């Protein structure tokens, strides 16, 4: 079982209450961020623009970028005794990708031919799980190798955090960061720390990228009347303004993110070794893939450009909306797979497959109507959101096609990636080296893995998945227990049939989180 290190400074630094009804001024959650302007972020981000060309035509959409080499002060506590092994690394994080929406993870409906092919050349982890959710807590885990539990707060890296990029930079590895996941660069966020260069592709979702012309766009033309509300209207109007220059597939965010990654590789191929971190917001909402991908799942949609994203009230969604929503998401997944496939082809053409480790994963999944839930829902903390795809391709062909069934967690990413690059001297992390499962050195690194999303927490092992509210009375869809031996898809709550198993898992969850959680209430 993973040894949990103390990393709860954010909840105890100033004696903050764990009661979510007592809010502190300095914390930023996703909902509050959406309503804030990016104007207050300072001039550091706007160091320059790179005009990108697509098919011989200069893109109208800028990519903000910067070089932090002269401003980033590396933490003194990073040792430098290890010598990197000269392998490169490319990490691809694609937001909100359900594991069961990949052919290599068992989907027969959703088309993902490029990642399916990639998986055949790679190690595929069948039991990878998120730790802190949603977007920003997950990135804190990925970039530091440290647990964020028992909290799962929407806040930047702490000054005391040491990031993956900072460790690599200290060891002489060139680091690059490309993201259209705008939360990385939101007010007070700092996830570009330690990168020699970074690029922010503007305009995703509700990024306050453009402010007009508001009167030109009417979200009601893109959604059923029964789904409309003022908040949804405001969010989708922002998105329509952000994408007003979109003319062809090359203008979509997913395409532009992967194109920016190709450009970076061409520019840095001689900076060996290097690490490129590509963080794509797709297939996150809004789900509006190009028409040719949407038509793979249905011939006709209710609207020429049907927009589905945050702001919809779940109570307004009708049963006849769900098939359309599922097809919109499937199309977004297939389009994202296509874009990643183009990037993988470029990597191969550049001759990088023989000396580069390539990682594909996500932060979490989403709900598509399960138990009445649509979009990621804390109160239904099941595999739809906690189970994540994780595929790692190593140049050593002995690892091609391996499937690892042992439990792994998001907190294991950095403790695995560093040794893969030959860096063994940095140890201040909470996770384990999951590559030992691939080499056969160990058969297991965790007995249980844990996830927290808002006020809900889960414990997962090879036999059971259990979740409940860990801070209050709102049960959500819990307490919930799934029997994974007989219900791999987590469709049937058996908490009343196996109360003793539920109590045992509840106690383990409390012990791991090191907080008092509500008792099991049946």
Report residues per predicted region.
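N-terminal acidic, proline/glycine-rich, low-complexity intrinsically disordered segments
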Residues: 1-11
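N-terminal secretory signal peptides and thylakoid transit peptides that target proteins
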Residues: 16-41
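Catalytic domains that recognize anionic headgroups
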Residues: 33-48, 54-522
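Intrinsically disordered, low-complexity regions enriched in serine, threonine, proline
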Residues: 6, 27-28, 50, 66
């Amino acid at each position: 079982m993973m040894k949990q290190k103390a990393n709860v400074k954010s909840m105890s630094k100033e004696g903050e209450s764990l009661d979510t009804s007592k809010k502190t001024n300095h914390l930023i959650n996703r909902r509050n961020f959406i309503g804030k302007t990016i104007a207050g972020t300072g001039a550091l981000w706007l160091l320059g623009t790179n005009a990108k060309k697509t098919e011989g035509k200069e893109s109208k959409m800028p990519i903000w970028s910067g070089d932090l080499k002269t401003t980033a002060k590396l933490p003194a506590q990073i040792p430098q005794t290890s010598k990197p092994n000269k392998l490169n690394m490319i990490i691809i994080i694609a937001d909100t990708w359900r594991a069961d929406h990949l052919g290599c993870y068992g989907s027969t409906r959703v088309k993902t031919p490029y990642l399916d092919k990639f998986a055949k050349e790679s190690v595929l982890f069948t039991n990878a799980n998120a730790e802190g959710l949603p977007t920003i807590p997950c990135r804190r885990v990925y970039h530091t190798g440290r647990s964020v539990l028992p909290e799962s707060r929407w806040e930047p890296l702490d000054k005391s955090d040491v990031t993956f990029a900072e460790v690599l930079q200290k060891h002489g590895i060139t680091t690059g960061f490309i993201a259209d996941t705008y939360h990385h660069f939101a007010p007070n966020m700092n996830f570009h720390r330690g990168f020699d260069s970074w690029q922010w592709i503007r305009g995703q979702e509700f990024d306050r990228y453009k402010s007009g012309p508001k009167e030109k766009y009417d979200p009601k033309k893109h959604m059923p009347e029964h789904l409309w509300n003022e908040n949804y209207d405001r969010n989708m109007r922002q998105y329509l303004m952000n994408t007003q220059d979109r003319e062809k597939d090359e203008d979509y965010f997913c395409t532009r993110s992967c194109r920016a990654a190709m450009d970076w590789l061409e520019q840095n191929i001689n900076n060996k070794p290097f690490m490129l971190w590509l963080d794509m917001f797709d297939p996150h909402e809004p789900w509006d893939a190009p028409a040719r991908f949407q038509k793979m799942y249905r011939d006709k949609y209710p609207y020429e450009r049907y927009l589905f994203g945050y702001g919809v009230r779940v109570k307004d969604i009708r049963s006849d909306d769900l098939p359309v929503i599922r097809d919109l998401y499937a199309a977004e997944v297939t389009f994202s797979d296509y874009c990643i496939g183009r990037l993988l082809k470029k990597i191969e053409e550049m001759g990088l497959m023989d000396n580069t480790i390539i990682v594909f994963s996500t932060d979490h999944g989403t709900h598509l109507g399960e138990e009445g839930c649509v979009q990621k829902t804390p109160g239904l903390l099941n595999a739809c959101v906690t189970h994540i795809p994780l595929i790692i391709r190593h140049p050593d062909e002995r690892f091609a096609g391996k499937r690892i069934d042992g439990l792994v967690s998001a907190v294991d990413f950095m403790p695995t990636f560093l040794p893969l690059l030959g860096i063994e001297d940095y140890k201040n992390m909470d996770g384990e080296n999951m590559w030992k499962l691939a080499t056969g050195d160990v058969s297991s690194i965790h007995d249980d893995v844990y996830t927290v999303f808002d006020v809900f927490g889960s414990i997962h092992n090879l036999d059971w998945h259990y979740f409940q509210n860990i801070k209050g009375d709102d049960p959500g869809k819990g307490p919930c227990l799934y029997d994974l031996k007989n219900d791999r898809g987590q469709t049937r709550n058996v908490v009343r049939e196996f109360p003793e198993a539920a109590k045992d898992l509840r106690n383990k969850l409390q012990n791991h989180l090191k907080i008092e959680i509500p008792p099991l209430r049946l």
